[in-house]
Structures are given as C-alpha cells and as structure tokens.
C-alpha cells in the first residue's frame, strides 16, 4: 500500500513537472518571438518619424499651409505609434490578452490612416512637390504598407499560436486523464482482485 501511494505521488509530481516545463517553454517562445517583432516594428516607426522630420525641414518653401498641417498630424501619429510599440515591448508577456489585441487593432488603424494620408498628399501635391519629395512619399507609403502587413501577420500568428497551444493542451489533458483512469482501475484490481 505504501508503494502504491509512493507511485501515485511520483505520477502527480511528474505531471506537475511536465506542466511547469510546458509553461516555461511557452513563455520563452513568446518572449523571443515578441522581442524580434517589436524590434522590427519599432525600427519601422522610427524610420517613419525620421522621414517626417526630414520632409518637414526640406519642404518649407513649397508646401502649402494645408500640407504643413497634414505633415504635423502625420508626425504626431508616428510619435504615438512609436510610443505604442515601446509600451507593447515592455509588456510583451501580456500581449496575447484582450488589451494587447485592442492595441494591435489601434496600431493597425493608425497605419491605415498613415497610408491614406500619403495617398492624399501624393494626389493633391503633384503641382508643387519636387521629384525628391515624390520619391520620399513613395518610400513612406511602402513603409506604411509593410507596417500594416506586419500588424496583420502578428495578429494572425498570435491567433494560430493560441489555437495550436490550446489543442495541444487539450490533447495532453485527455491523455493524462485516461492514464490516471487506467491507473485507478489497475489499483482497484490489485487491491480487491
């Protein structure tokens, strides 16, 4: 009887160790994946902010007051986006929560607004933007599209990871339940014959 109790404790300890190991591996995976993606997003946001500053400094002589206001608005949005990425990086362990999902949606919306702004500037500024400014607008539009694609990929990957993790844990729990049930049956047979 003592041997059976020891076996039960050993199996419970083994299950607890496996759960702890799975939890550690999951946290490590999330940490590495999130760090790389947030580093890429932060770099893109910094490049956008640098572009706005450069465009504002070199375009004072031919940008209208309306275009100046739009540049200021876009620069403010880029700064907000950079601040969001820094905040998301600092709280990466919680990025799969509902709050992080909402922030990802907010960042995607801001990226779409930036893309719409670039398209509007390109359409309304053909008569006074130089060839250099046109090239910079195209570069910024490409960066905004890449940033939008990154956010969509991050959201899809997060959902796929959550689904795969949930399936794996469900299968593992089912297997452990069946193993425990068989052990109890064997225990019953060994005690009562």
From Swiss-Prot:
Q: Where in the cell is it found?
A: Gas vesicle
Protein's UniProt keywords contain Repeat: yes
Q: Does the keyword Repeat apply?
A: yes
What is the applied biotechnology use of this protein, as the UniProt note states?
Can be used as an oxygen carrier in mammalian cell culture; addition of 1.8% GVs in the medium enhanced the maximum glucose utilization rate by about 30%. The GVs have both GvpA and GvpC.
In the record for this protein, the sequence repeats are positioned at: 19-51, 52-84, 85-117, 118-150, 151-183
Q: Where is it predominantly found? A: other
Sorted alphabetically, the Gene Ontology cellular component annotations on this record are: gas vesicle
Keywords recorded for this protein, A-Z = Gas vesicle, Repeat
InterPro entries per the record?
Gas-vesicle_GvpC (IPR002003), Gas_vesicle_C_repeat (IPR018185)
Induction per UniProt is: Gas vesicles are abundant in low light, and collapse after exposure to high light.
> Which residue spans traverse the membrane?
none
Domain of life the protein comes from:
Bacteria
* Segments for region (5 X 33 AA tandem repeats): 19-183
- Which Pfam families does the record match to this protein? Gas_vesicle_C
Misc remark for this entry? Protein sequence was derived from constitutive gas vesicle producer strain CCAP 1403/13f, DNA sequence from CCAP 1403/13d, a spontaneous mutant which does not produce gas vesicles.
Q: Please describe what this protein does.
A: Confers stability, involved in shaping gas vesicles (GV), hollow, gas-filled proteinaceous nanostructures. During planktonic growth they allow positioning of the organism at a favorable depth for light or nutrient acquisition. The ratio of GvpA:GvpC is estimated to be 25:1. GvpC strengthens the GV wall, probably by connecting several GvpA proteins in the same and/or adjacent ribs. Removal of GvpC by SDS reduces the critical collapse pressure (CCP) of stored gas vesicles from 0.23 Mpa to 0.08 MPa.
Q: Which family does it belong to?
A: Belongs to the gas vesicle GvpC family.
Domain notes for this protein: The tandem repeats probably bind across adjacent GvpA ribs with each repeat contacting 5 GvpA subunits, stiffening the vesicle.
Protein name in UniProt: Gas vesicle protein C
